[in-house]
Amino acid sequence: MLSRRIIPCLDVRDGRVVKGVKFRDHIDMGDIVELALRYRAQGADELVFYDIGASPEGRSVDYTWVERVARLIDIPFCVAGGIGDVETARAVLHAGADKISINSPALGRPQLISELADAFGVQCVVVGIDSIREEDGQWRVRRYTGDPSKTQALPMRTLDWVAEAQRLGAGEIVLNCMDNDGVRRGYDIAQLRQVRALCRVPLIASGGAGEMQHFADVFDQADVDGALAASVFHSGAIPIPELKRFLRAQQIEVRDGQ
């Protein structure tokens, strides 16, 4: 496996970075570009930006901040939010994003994954999956999680959707474990291991990081390709240079950074 990736996640609403707990109660965390520059300087491997209101509000992402970020950072970044067709994806990539991520629009029209893969190559197409464990013990997907008033519970099992997304051309999967989001108690290793067993493309863990050991655990125990986190990076609780030194000390290969 290639070096593991450390990926700050920036949820965007009204031109600002916000963060919630379990996709609820978002608070302002700062300016998009300022945070992007901070993470670039600290040695982040890439960035993910989620315009969390775009899909629930039926609009596309705001290209102006995508262009601002692209002008100022030289690490890869992925943009998600309201990308429901090839032309919108093309505009986001033209604005400077390296990858686009789709979530709710793909649940409504799965063929979108194939259309994007055919147009831009699988390396550009990330499928984000918001997953929650239900009372019967099954993990199932949620839609429109950026707006609590519009969130939809779907009958589709998470594992089935992972398999289908791959078949259609997803080049990477980001698994957002909603039960763990923002609570800082560790990644959902059990769920990630099940997804890893059937996921042939790069798998990124999201939701639950609270301390450096949580990153080591998810790499060692779930064999994910990257770990995404937000609140511990935004708050400064885990500086990325220290995290990379910690992981190297545990014989986990990470990319060079500070």
Swiss-Prot record:
GO terms for molecular function: imidazoleglycerol-phosphate synthase activity; lyase activity. It is an enzyme of class 4 (lyase). The lineage of its organism: Bacteria, Pseudomonadati, Pseudomonadota, Gammaproteobacteria, Lysobacterales. Its EC number is 4.3.2.10. The gene is hisF. It holds the Pfam family His_biosynth. Heterodimer of HisH and HisF. This is Imidazole glycerol phosphate synthase subunit HisF. Keywords: Amino-acid biosynthesis, Cytoplasm, Histidine biosynthesis, Lyase. It catalyses: 5-[(5-phospho-1-deoxy-D-ribulos-1-ylimino)methylamino]-1-(5-phospho-beta-D-ribosyl)imidazole-4-carboxamide + L-glutamine = D-erythro-1-(imidazol-4-yl)glycerol 3-phosphate + 5-amino-1-(5-phospho-beta-D-ribosyl)imidazole-4-carboxamide + L-glutamate + H(+). It comes from the Bacteria. InterPro entries: Aldolase_TIM, His_biosynth, HisF, IGPS_HisA/HisF, RibuloseP-bd_barrel. The active site is at D11, D130. It is found in: Cytoplasm. It comes from Xanthomonas euvesicatoria pv. vesicatoria (strain 85-10) (Xanthomonas campestris pv. vesicatoria). Pathway: Amino-acid biosynthesis; L-histidine biosynthesis; L-histidine from 5-phospho-alpha-D-ribose 1-diphosphate: step 5/9. GO terms for biological process: L-histidine biosynthetic process. GO terms for cellular component: cytoplasm. Belongs to the HisA/HisF family. The keyword Cytoplasm applies. PANTHER family: IMIDAZOLE GLYCEROL PHOSPHATE SYNTHASE HISHF, IMIDAZOLE GLYCEROL PHOSPHATE SYNTHASE SUBUNIT HISF/H IGP SYNTHASE SUBUNIT HISF/H.
